[in-house]
């Protein structure tokens, strides 16, 4: 895009007020990091789901650490992430196709994505009105219906020791919200000033 002149053209359109915001879509943390280094994007469409975050699936590009580092950087730099592939093309919703061999619900997948740093919205695929009605039910779903802590019972071995803020380890004997503490810690390590105040 840089050598072709497309980026310069988009920048010109933004300066003229024709383009209000510049965003991009990618499945690769490395590609997005390079775009962030240019300081031009304000929005990112990125594939986030438990399968991809744990290197399971066609678009599972980058390690868990690389992906989390990208989410944290986007949050720190004010680049909103719109999530695509939240259900991994439906694979996570069926035990037969799930890389975990257990099905998750749509609500669990949506909440999982929303809980990642930098995420501002999830764009689930809608095929018909029934899908739309079901997805809108997320807004009325109970915390139990959104809870994805079951992931802690079947995530791959490579994920051990990496907190994904699911609170599967709860209840803490000391009454601490372990997921939230780890989230603030991760944000603080990434340089988020607000998180440092909380941590």
Where would I find each of the regions flagged by the language model?
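Structured C-terminal cap/extension of enzyme domains
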Residues: 65-199
